[in-house]
Design a protein with these regions (language model features):
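Bacterial N-terminal signal peptides that target proteins for export
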Residues: 1-9
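Bacterial N-terminal signal peptides
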Residues: 8-16
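N-terminal signal peptide c-region/cleavage motif recognized by signal peptidases
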Residues: 18-20
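Short sequence/structural segments immediately N-terminal
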Residues: 28-30, 79
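The canonical Cys-X-X-Cys-His
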Residues: 32-39, 101
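Axial heme c-ligation environment in periplasmic c-type cytochrome domains
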Residues: 44-55, 68-97
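Periplasmic c-type cytochrome electron-transfer domains
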Residues: 60, 90-105
């Protein structure tokens, strides 16, 4: 009985996570992020899985990435982007949405 309950709970959690990931991707699309990024592959900017891997375990990464998305910049991914800058997304994208997007990327 416990194993069955655990399996049901795990399946429900997976559905919630995939639903959240879908909502996060929709927010990324609406915000214009997918013009330069994708989860798996470099487009203009780095793949988000590569960003997550680079900053894994870095306690200050979230705040730095939020600032990078807000203000834009260049230099961190020059080898990948060929020097193409990250454009600023604030105030066009709300601060709370930028934070959600950064959480999504770092959680990959």
């Amino acid at each position: 009985m416990k194993a069955k309950l655990f399996a049901i709970s795990a399946a429900a959690a997976a559905l919630l996570i995939s639903g959240q990931a879908s909502a996060d991707l929709e927010l990324a699309k609406k915000s214009g992020c997918l013009a330069c990024h994708s989860v798996e592959k470099k487009v203009v900017g780095p793949a988000w899985k590569d960003v997550a891997a680079k900053y894994k375990g870095d306690a200050g990464a979230k705040e730095r990435l939020i600032e990078k998305v807000k203000k834009g910049g260049k230099g961190n991914w020059t080898a990948v982007t060929g020097g193409a800058p990250m454009p600023p997304y604030s105030p066009r994208v709300k601060d709370e949405d930028i934070a959600k997007l950064v959480d999504f990327v770092l959680g990959l």
